[in-house]
Amino acid sequence: MAKPFFRLQKFLRRTQFLLFFLTAAYLMTGSLLLLQRVRVALPQGPRAPGPLQTLPVAAVALGVGLLDSRALHDPRVSPELLLGVDMLQSPLTRPRPGPRWLRSRNSELRQLRRRWFHHFMSDSQGPPALGPEAARPAIHSRGTYIGCFSDDGHERTLKGAVFYDLRKMTVSHCQDACAERSYVYAGLEAGAECYCGNRLPAVSVGLEECNHECKGEKGSVCGAVDRLSVYRVDELQPGSRKRRTATYRGCFRLPENITHAFPSSLIQANVTVGTCSGFCSQKEFPLAILRGWECYCAYPTPRFNLRDAMDSSVCGQDPEAQRLAEYCEVYQTPVQDTRCTDRRFLPNKSKVFVALSSFPGAGNTWARHLIEHATGFYTGSYYFDGTLYNKGFKGEKDHWRSRRTICVKTHESGRREIEMFDSAILLIRNPYRSLVAEFNRKCAGHLGYAADRNWKSKEWPDFVNSYASWWSSHVLDWLKYGKRLLVVHYEELRRSLVPTLREMVAFLNVSVSEERLLCVENNKEGSFRRRGRRSHDPEPFTPEMKDLINGYIRTVDQALRDHNWTGLPREYVPR
């Protein structure tokens, strides 16, 4: 009896060992397959830096944004990038057939966060360094290579204008950007940054110190960290158009102390607008002022802030009468006002976690541009948008919870998402304008316009029915669950930019000089505004749509008043 029992016990032990071995082999095989999939999906190279690590370069002027249905068919998008996105989206989370806005809002926001992770991993590597023998100027450059110069982030060598392009920066692209704005010199730094100016740096360094390859041009040198590859701009590429030399700003009364208000001047007979603008551009001033035969160059200042314009007929007199009347004509030169272009991450983690919350299409990107240039600190984002990062929003790639940015963009609503923040700026825009702006963005990107076929299709009414209620619930949720709020209306920000922006900056607990606010006002549009208007603007809202939206407007207006805020601006409220 004991012998069979012993045999059975021995068999069970062997079976147990065999099962353990098979389980271990199964787990190891699965792990190896998973690692192989990750290696295929993500580019080879160093690991991405942690969320609190400083990223290598500022953002850019062009590049691939979020991978929507249009980007999947874009030949410029690499197969590796598409494969990586495909790996991150399981079959259960892939988009359903039909327009994107027919999916639930939460599903769309989750996909934004997935894309953030992939873009963070794929773009985190710095620009490749070239060996000393490869450090050479671009062969196809239309400018004259001057040399390699040192640069300082706090005191730029070329101070005229700044552009970024993390994916496509080339020497020709930088030269054209500077030539369009009438600059003489173009400097490239860290493979993706372009600086313009009219004054050549004083001290050069060895050519071997400029050893970073241009992001969009293999084998060409685009400076290095704190090193500029400087070219003299000779001519524009074919098809490029030079910007207007001067834009009329209005007729203004002269300040009391002209010498103090206007740092540079030119007095000559028969001076013209072009002559004065060219002179001030050479001196790197954004304003050219004409008073009779006198030309002055200046920045907007508290003494000369360009807010109290006179009737243009006052400046239409002959030069001598105009000079005696103490009036002047002001023109904007192609030169960028760079007093407020420097930005950085917060030196220490912020103790107050601030949201910049809005409904999509309410001007969140524009508000971020204003806040960044007013405070000098980057703004973050709950999502990742490669197009915004490429346009200079460097905080876009920083983890939204890093607390290294002055505030964090979000379109989220709901108690859990709202209570993660200590305070918030709630940006509200007329829902009619917001819905049109967001529909344009979804159909044609940040700077484009939806085609007529989009407005006439079933996509537009489906979009309105889905998103109009979100406009209302977004405001109501933030009023209900927000711990500390500042309500800002987009229309008021456009009408009274400096006072409203001053209030926003004070809410963020940042001290800002009046000169910096005036600089922001001078550069208020930035690079993310739809230029011009459509040849014909359709009336997209049917009477049924208007009844629906007007009901939401009344609800939000009453909720604001119930929470001791002023109601919506009069142009929102239906009459």
Curated annotation (Swiss-Prot):
<feature type="domain" description="WSC 2">
    <location>
        <begin position="245"/>
        <end position="340"/>
    </location>
</feature>
<keyword id="KW-0472">Membrane</keyword>
<feature type="topological domain" description="Cytoplasmic">
    <location>
        <begin position="1"/>
        <end position="14"/>
    </location>
</feature>
<keyword id="KW-0677">Repeat</keyword>
<keyword id="KW-0325">Glycoprotein</keyword>
<protein>
    <recommendedName>
        <fullName>Sialate:O-sulfotransferase 1</fullName>
    </recommendedName>
</protein>
<dbReference type="InterPro" id="IPR027417">
    <property type="entry name" value="P-loop_NTPase"/>
</dbReference>
<comment type="similarity">
    <text>Belongs to the WSCD family.</text>
</comment>
<feature type="glycosylation site" description="N-linked (GlcNAc...) asparagine">
    <location>
        <position position="348"/>
    </location>
</feature>
<feature type="domain" description="WSC 1">
    <location>
        <begin position="142"/>
        <end position="234"/>
    </location>
</feature>
<keyword id="KW-1133">Transmembrane helix</keyword>
<feature type="glycosylation site" description="N-linked (GlcNAc...) asparagine">
    <location>
        <position position="257"/>
    </location>
</feature>
<dbReference type="GO" id="GO:0000139">
    <property type="term" value="C:Golgi membrane"/>
</dbReference>
<dbReference type="GO" id="GO:0008146">
    <property type="term" value="F:sulfotransferase activity"/>
</dbReference>
<dbReference type="Pfam" id="PF01822">
    <property type="entry name" value="WSC"/>
</dbReference>
<dbReference type="Pfam" id="PF00685">
    <property type="entry name" value="Sulfotransfer_1"/>
</dbReference>
<keyword id="KW-0812">Transmembrane</keyword>
<keyword id="KW-0333">Golgi apparatus</keyword>
<feature type="transmembrane region" description="Helical; Signal-anchor for type II membrane protein">
    <location>
        <begin position="15"/>
        <end position="35"/>
    </location>
</feature>
<dbReference type="InterPro" id="IPR002889">
    <property type="entry name" value="WSC_carb-bd"/>
</dbReference>
<keyword id="KW-0735">Signal-anchor</keyword>
<dbReference type="InterPro" id="IPR000863">
    <property type="entry name" value="Sulfotransferase_dom"/>
</dbReference>
<comment type="function">
    <text>Sialate:O-sulfotransferase which catalyzes 8-O-sulfation at the Sia-glycan level using 3'-phosphoadenosine 5'-phosphosulfate (PAPS) as a donor, forming 8-O-sulfated Sia (Sia8S)-glycans. Displays selectivity toward glycolipids such as GM1 gangliosides.</text>
</comment>
<dbReference type="InterPro" id="IPR051589">
    <property type="entry name" value="Sialate-O-sulfotransferase"/>
</dbReference>
<feature type="topological domain" description="Extracellular">
    <location>
        <begin position="36"/>
        <end position="575"/>
    </location>
</feature>
